[in-house]
């Protein structure tokens, strides 16, 4: 097996941080190109207007700016990517991606675009009912990825 390109998925949790460290070490061992992806999921804002109780018509907006919210998310994404590279890959050339949309689908799309040979992802910390209702990002990636997926647990750390 030859691994020429490793794609590392990074979110804001400890599981993903540990997986990133593991992924960069794997890339070093194989002398592989490395990609780092962070997915920005769109935030759906609830209706932010107040309604006049007598006439039932909207009276004013609460002023939440979706563009500003997207800028904040973009900034957070850039920060986590930069911090991860500084911490684990300062000596490496890393191609980084910020994708928008569903986390699992974004990782898979990025893997295809990067021509990754393997995806490295952390286990997700969801458990119980939350996992049942929401699903698992790593599970979705494993089931739908066109390339092998290495799921790195936090246990044993």
Locate predicted features.
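Active-site phosphate/pyrophosphate- and oxyanion-stabilizing loops and adjacent acidic/basic residues
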Residues: 24, 82, 86, 139
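A short acidic, glycine-rich active-site loop
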Residues: 57-76
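Short, well-ordered coil/turn elements that cap or connect secondary structure elements
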Residues: 29, 89-91, 144
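Gly/Ser-rich helix-loop-strand patches that form or flank binding pockets
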Residues: 108-157
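Small/aliphatic-rich secondary-structure junction motif
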Residues: 2-63
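Structural beta-alpha unit
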Residues: 1, 42-44, 75, 79, ...
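General small-molecule cofactor/ligand-binding pocket signal
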Residues: 37, 95-99, 150
């Amino acid at each position: 097996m030859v691994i020429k390109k490793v794609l590392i998925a990074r979110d804001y949790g400890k599981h993903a941080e540990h997986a990133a460290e593991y992924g960069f070490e794997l890339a070093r061992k194989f002398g592989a190109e490395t990609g780092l992806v962070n997915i920005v999921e769109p935030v759906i804002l609830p209706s932010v207007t107040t309604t006049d109780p007598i006439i039932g018509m909207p009276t004013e907006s609460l002023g939440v700016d979706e563009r500003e919210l997207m800028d904040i998310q973009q900034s957070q994404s850039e920060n986590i990517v930069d911090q991860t590279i500084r911490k684990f890959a300062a000596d490496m050339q890393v191609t980084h991606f910020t994708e928008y949309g569903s986390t699992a689908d974004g990782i898979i799309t990025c893997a295809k675009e990067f021509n990754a040979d393997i995806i490295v992802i952390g286990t997700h910390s969801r458990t119980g009912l939350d996992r049942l209702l929401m699903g698992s990002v790593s599970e979705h990636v494993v089931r739908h990825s066109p390339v092998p997926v290495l799921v790195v647990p936090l246990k044993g750390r």
